Amino acid sequence: LAEIWKGSAKDKDSAITIAFGTGIAGSVVWNNHVHHGKHLIAGEFSSLLLDGDYQNCEVINFSTRCATSSMVKKEAQVLNLPLEEMSGEILFEKASQGDMAMQDILNETYYHTAIQILNIQTIYDPDVFLIGSGISEQPCVIEGINRYIQEIHAQSPRLVIPVVRACTFKNDANLLGALYHHLAQFEN
């Protein structure tokens, strides 16, 4: 709501926000209103399926592979350090210093996020995708996602290239969205 109200989707009718954290949440906005869906799960992107094994009927979801918490777990495994000593900040710092293993963790996230965004673009076709939460503070995130979108598009040119940006309010978008919701309720 904050991004539609005063942020990166201010002049847009439709938007998808994606926030990485313990899971992967977000929102689906259509005609400037949040779409909740019949079962109130629209925007719960954690459950989107990425991959699986048909022989054992096992699936891997978006959150398991790409949530910030999952990236930090991979970081701890690669560095053979306790999970409590790891963080997203350390992951990004090591990647920016040239640590190839940390760059691979980030690239895997960018790649799978690009695929999910392209799938959602094909189904829903919003004006813009906005990446929020703490991860959006890192410019390399939007650059990485857009790089993979371009590479995938080169292989599948029928896909529409979506607009992907960082949330204006980054990690505070949820707080400002709650304020907007409160003000809207108060006016009514």
Language model feature labels by segment:
Residues 1:
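Acidic/histidine-rich catalytic cores of soluble enzymes
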Residues 5-11, 50-188:
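ATP-binding/phosphotransfer module of carbohydrate and carboxylate kinases, centering on a glycine-rich
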Residues 9-66:
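Glycine-rich phosphate-binding loop of actin/hexokinase-like ATP-binding domains
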